[in-house]
């Protein structure tokens, strides 16, 4: 298989089995752990593989490996600013820790459960494989919505204000512009950005997508990495209680803000040709 032959990164989950030749609950358990590890890597790095990721399940008996099942995943889309960043050892360690925490979180006795947080995480992982840049931007904005619980009719205003907990003050104009892209896609008005090719508009979309992805990913990673944050972000009632706290109380719980502009530190239009912008 070409994907396996060319692969230089393997995420492995294994356990001892009394029935290694049977695809049963043990197989499902190691598959889930491998998947959690992979999701952890998505949160730890903006990596994009050269081939579609593959999940192989099987057994090892008498020194021989027997592959019993193969699943192909949709491939994460390369970024425009840094298409193929290296996956470094710190990324792997972070991915493993996040993967372990995801397994713990799935069975944690949280009041109100954890559906909302896992749904938000699902939206993020799906967005990483979405081809069109405005659709990715839309989905990453939805991830942020999932973590701030905006009220109906006040979504744009609260998208600007409530994200201060993640990125600090001073970014209201930026967040408003991001929300405008989200709203355009939601109401099928993305022709404003895509119908005719304008290089400056497309470059601006590149920056916006990179920024909103960075906010969504780093916020999710911090929440999953810190079990003290789980009771505040796992579900809708928890978020309502969190929003009812004072700003200083919320800041104390969250910690230092994320710098959203880190995502575009390497942005240089001279290295971005029109073909990368969809022309």
Please report, for each region that a protein language model flagged, where it lies by residue:
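Charged, non-catalytic interaction/linker regions at domain boundaries
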Residues: 1-135, 222, 230-278
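Short runs of predominantly hydrophobic/aromatic residues within well-ordered alpha helices
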Residues: 117-120, 136-140, 144, 178, ...
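Generic structural signal for hydrophobic core residues of well-folded globular domains
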Residues: 124-127, 131, 144-151, 166, ...
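Flexible secondary-structure boundary motifs
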Residues: 135-172, 191
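Histidine-centered, metal-coordinating catalytic motifs and their short helical/loop contexts
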Residues: 169-198
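C-terminal structured domain segments
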Residues: 192-247
């Amino acid at each position: 298989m070409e994907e396996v032959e060319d692969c230089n990164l393997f995420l492995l989950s294994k356990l001892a089995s009394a029935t290694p030749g049977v695809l049963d609950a043990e197989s499902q358990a190691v598959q889930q752990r491998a998947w959690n590890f992979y999701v952890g890597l998505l949160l730890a790095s903006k990596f994009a593989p050269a081939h579609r990721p593959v999940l192989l399940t099987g057994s090892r008996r008498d020194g021989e490996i027997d592959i019993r099942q193969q699943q192909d995943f949709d491939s994460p889309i390369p970024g425009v600013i840094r298409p193929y960043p290296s996956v470094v050892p710190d990324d792997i360690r972070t991915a493993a820790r996040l993967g372990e925490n995801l397994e713990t979180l799935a069975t944690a006795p949280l009041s109100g459960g954890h559906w909302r947080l896992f749904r938000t995480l699902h939206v993020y992982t799906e967005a990483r494989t979405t081809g069109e840049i405005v659709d990715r931007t839309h989905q990453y904005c939805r991830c942020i919505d999932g973590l701030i619980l905006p009220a109906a009719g006040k979504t744009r205003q609260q998208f600007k204000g409530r994200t201060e907990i993640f990125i600090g003050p001073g970014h209201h104009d930026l967040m408003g512009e991001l929300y405008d892209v989200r709203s355009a896609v939601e109401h099928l008005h993305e022709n404003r950005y895509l119908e005719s090719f304008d290089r400056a508009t497309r470059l601006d979309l590149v920056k916006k997508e990179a920024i909103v992805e960075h906010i969504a990913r780093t916020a999710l990673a911090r929440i999953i990495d810190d079990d003290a944050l789980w009771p505040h972000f796992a579900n809708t009632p928890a978020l309502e209680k969190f929003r009812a706290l004072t700003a200083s109380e919320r800041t104390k719980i969250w910690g230092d803000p994320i710098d959203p502009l880190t995502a575009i530190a390497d942005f240089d239009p001279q290295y971005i040709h029109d073909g990368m912008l969809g022309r």
